[in-house]
From Swiss-Prot:
Gene that encodes it: encB
Protein name, entry field: Encapsulin nanocompartment cargo protein EncB
Similarity comment: Belongs to the ferritin-like superfamily.
Binding annotation for Fe cation 2: E22, E52, H55
Gene3D superfamilies with a match to the protein in the record: 6.10.140.1960
Protein's organism: Myxococcus xanthus (strain DK1622)
Coiled coil region boundaries: none
Amino acid sequence: MAGPPDSDLDDVARIRLVLARELETINEYEAYARASSNPEVRAFFQHLAAEEKEHVSEAVHMLRMLDSGQNDHFAKPFVPGHFQAAEAPAPATVHVPTPDGPAFSVNGRNGRLPSEPPTSLPPQRLLYGLPAPPPAVESHPLTVGSLRRGGGGSGSGR
């Protein structure tokens, strides 16, 4: 689905698009690493994924600086049970028999048992539960090509 041209977007919208692309790229690099049988190639893709994670942190930092409403959401703590309270009514239970055992009930959400939590992470560790740290002091605030301050990439390095 094509969106508006980049020239029609404001800075916050551009950063959100970059953030979405960075997150997708992390998934791709990590999948490539898992699929590789060569340890050196696997390490290469893990290295690339780690760099993308730094970009995600930087993009979130920029969003927090530019969008006070978004920043308010990052600063808001999540209490245990927050996500369970927000769930819609459970879908109809589907009974799936096991090949050589009794039937058990699955609620249809990613094949999880009804008693299984959606994540094993504590609520305060979820993406929106922790504020993103600012970029490291010794690092460039922006590290992508022409955006990099002090040179790098093919841009002017202003």
